[in-house]
């Protein structure tokens, strides 16, 4: 029990404060940087900050769900999804740096809240936990679609990162459904969307 607590605490510290690492090459790494005006550059950096905070939330959600999951297949899928979300963290962190931006100052708050939510979802049972994962990924996919629409057309580097993230999120949702995810009730899905809007609006600025 103590060993597991140490492992989980270490994971939280690394997610929040250590540079994230990616096994896969960063999407758009070979694409030449395009000159963006100051306003566009700040806007894209803010969008990527929102995406980075979203990945912080995903890490905490999956950590909480994994801690309370009972089925080994569910634990494995959560671990695999978490690994890919770590890559997303690395990609968005790198892009924020390239654009001269910064990460959200509220990331520890997002992490703590998402960890608690993940623990709660896991306590409801594996199929409901998978349903939570699938719905989270669907909403993230829709959110990334919106970001693609708001990117400057010439910013191909950011576009490639977001498109790969979107493909990964869709795959996570498909796997969760294949493992028997329950569809979440509409009020719960609506509450998730409301919470996501609060996070994205705040992380864009802070």
Curated annotation (Swiss-Prot):
Its cofactor is Fe cation. Pfam families: COQ7. InterPro entries: COQ7_proteobact, Ferritin-like, Ferritin-like_SF, Ubq_synth_Coq7. It is found in: Cell membrane. One of its GO terms (biological process) is ubiquinone biosynthetic process. Keywords: Cell membrane, Iron, Membrane, Metal-binding, Monooxygenase, Oxidoreductase, Ubiquinone biosynthesis. Fe cation 1 binds at residues 55, 85, 88, 169. One of its GO terms (molecular function) is 3-demethoxyubiquinol 3-hydroxylase activity. Its EC number is 1.14.99.60. Binds 2 iron ions per subunit. It is a peripheral membrane protein. Pathway: Cofactor biosynthesis; ubiquinone biosynthesis. It catalyses: a 5-methoxy-2-methyl-3-(all-trans-polyprenyl)benzene-1,4-diol + AH2 + O2 = a 3-demethylubiquinol + A + H2O. Gene3D superfamilies: 1.20.1260.10. Transmembrane segments: none annotated. Catalyzes the hydroxylation of 2-nonaprenyl-3-methyl-6-methoxy-1,4-benzoquinol during ubiquinone biosynthesis. Belongs to the COQ7 family. This is 3-demethoxyubiquinol 3-hydroxylase. It comes from Aromatoleum aromaticum (strain DSM 19018 / LMG 30748 / EbN1). The lineage of its organism: Bacteria, Pseudomonadati, Pseudomonadota, Betaproteobacteria, Rhodocyclales.
